[in-house]
Amino acid sequence: MKYKLLLLDIDGTLRPGSCEQIPKENAAAVRAVQKAGVKIAIATGRGRTGVGKGLLRDLKPDYWVCAGGAQLVDAKGNDLALHRLTAEEMYALVDFFEDYELPLRFTFHDANYAYIDFAEFDRREKAKNLYNNIVDGEDQDHHLVEMPFGCFGFLPREQAAQFQEKYGYLGLQFLYSYPGSDGCDIMQKGVNKGAGLCELAGLAGLTPEECVAIGDGDNDTAMLAAAGMGIAMANGSANAKAAADRTGPDAEPHGVADL
């Protein structure tokens, strides 16, 4: 089968953890695939606002699957699909995270707003070279401008279980990137990168079988499983590798270029 759409995760895949931007070798390899006629989509837990200028060097993706599948965007920056949190979902998260003094942020079009503990987000972002356009939102009022379509928090897994005991009827999912990590995307039921791949494929007139997906984290597993060909990086989680059709090289120093 001739694959027509390549979806690439950023952090831990296109961008090794040691780099502030994707290696030039990876950028060149993706451009070559695009020049050969394959459409390129960036599939990331970041909102579109969190992919800063220069992070992808000179890449010009045809599509974006952002906020873990909640925001689909075209090459010009127009939303193709948007799955916003409801007021009930958002308020439940804020109440719970405030009760336990846990860091929480929401994704909007202009920035990621840290509603709780901006300082902790700022510290972790700098330590991991993420630069995800996070601003101090502790006034907790930006949802009055628009409702968020992405959410990320830091909490132990046992506290995620406690949230589900209290608010399980909401159907929210806590998608941790890696075993042992306390950072997780918090998604609506049915929203993930795999669903985003399928939704984008439909909008582009393609089938999921015509797509290749490359990722490394637990939050990539649905995408790797949904694609016609799923490739997990060697540095990826066990769940990502289990969901993929094959395992590629380590993201360091420029694993995508070595595929």
What are these regions (language model features)?
Residues 2-19, 224:
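Asp-based phosphoryl-transfer active-site loop
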Residues 21-122:
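Active-site phosphate-binding/coordination module
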Residues 100-103, 107-214, 218-222, 226:
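Conserved acidic, metal-coordinating active-site core of Asp-based
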